[in-house]
Regions:
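Alpha-helical recognition segments enriched in aromatics with Gly/Pro capping
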Residues: 1-88
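Short helix-capping and inter-helix turn/linker motifs at the boundaries of alpha-helical repeat units
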Residues: 48, 135-136
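Helix-rich, typically C-terminal accessory recognition domains appended to large enzymatic cores
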Residues: 76, 89-127, 137-217
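Gly/Thr-rich phosphate-binding loop signature of adenosyl cofactor/nucleotide-binding cores
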Residues: 132
Length: 217
C-alpha cells in the first residue's frame, strides 16, 4: 500500500524496522506512513486492547449503523490527533448533524419537489440574488474537500460539507418556497429554488459517499 496508517506509538517501528524488512524481501515500500492518535474516554483514559477497556465497535455499529459511527469518528476527531469518545457525544452528533441538519434538508427538499412539481422540476428558471452565495459555496466545495481529503484532514472536509448544509437550510428560510407555491406567477422562481436545493443535495451526496457509502445512494 502507498500509505500505511499506524498508531502513533509504533511509528518508529513502521518507519525504520518495517521498511528494512520490506527491503530485505524486495517488497515495495510505503510512500507515506501516517501516525494516528489515540481514542480516549471522557475522563482522558486511553482505550487499549491489552487493558480490555475498549468500546465494542460491533455493538455500536449494530445499534447506530456503520455509516453513523464512521461519520462520528471522522468528524469529531481530527485525523492524527487524540480524540474523546462518549456515548453522549456520539448521540448528539448523530442527532444534530445527520438527523436534524442533513435529514431535515433532505426531507424538506424531496417533499417540496413532490408537492409542487410531482417530483419533476420544470425547465423554466428565474434567478435571484439570494441564489448567488449558495451557488458559489456549492461550486467551490468539491475543490475544498479534495484538498482536505488529500491531506487526510477528513474532519475539515466534513465541516465544509456541513457549512453548505447549514447555508442551504438557511436558503430555504430566505426564499420561502411555501409562499412561492401559492402564487402561480412565481412558478419559475419556485422551480429555481427547488432545483438549487436538489443540486446541492446531489453534490453533498457525492462528496459524502466516501464517508457514508451505505447512506448516500
Amino acid at each position: 500500500a502507498d500509505v500505511h496508517f499506524v498508531g502513533k506509538e509504533i511509528v518508529r517501528f513502521h518507519t525504520i524496522i518495517w521498511p528494512a524488512m520490506l527491503m530485505a524481501l524486495n517488497l515495495p515500500l510505503p510512500k507515506q506512513v501516517y501516525g494516528h492518535g489515540w481514542l480516549l474516554f471522557g475522563d482522558g483514559t486511553k482505550m487499549s486492547k491489552s487493558k480490555g477497556n475498549v468500546v465494542d465497535p460491533v455493538v455500536l455499529c449494530d445499534r447506530y449503523g456503520v455509516d453513523a459511527i464512521r461519520y462520528f469518528l471522522l468528524r469529531e476527531i481530527p485525523f492524527g490527533a487524540d480524540g474523546t469518545f462518549t456515548n453522549e457525544a456520539l448521540i448528539n452528533r448523530i442527532n444534530s448533524d445527520l438527523a436534524n441538519d442533513l435529514g431535515n434538508l433532505l426531507s424538506r427538499t424531496t417533499a417540496m419537489a413532490q408537492k409542487y412539481f410531482g417530483g419533476t422540476i420544470p425547465a423554466e428558471r428565474e434567478e435571484d440574488e439570494l441564489d448567488q452565495e449558495l451557488i458559489q459555496m456549492a461550486t467551490e466545495l468539491c475543490a475544498k474537500c479534495d484538498a482536505h481529503v488529500s491531506g487526510y484532514q477528513f474532519s475539515n472536509a466534513l465541516a465544509e460539507i456541513w457549512k453548505l448544509i447549514a447555508r442551504t437550510n438557511k436558503y430555504i428560510d430566505e426564499t420561502m418556497p411555501w409562499v412561492l407555491g401559492k402564487d402561480e406567477s412565481k412558478r419559475a422562481r419556485l422551480a429555481t429554488v427547488i432545483y438549487n436545493l436538489c443540486e446541492v443535495l446531489r453534490i453533498i451526496s457525492i462528496l459524502l459517499t466516501p464517508f457514508m457509502p451505505s447512506t448516500t445512494p
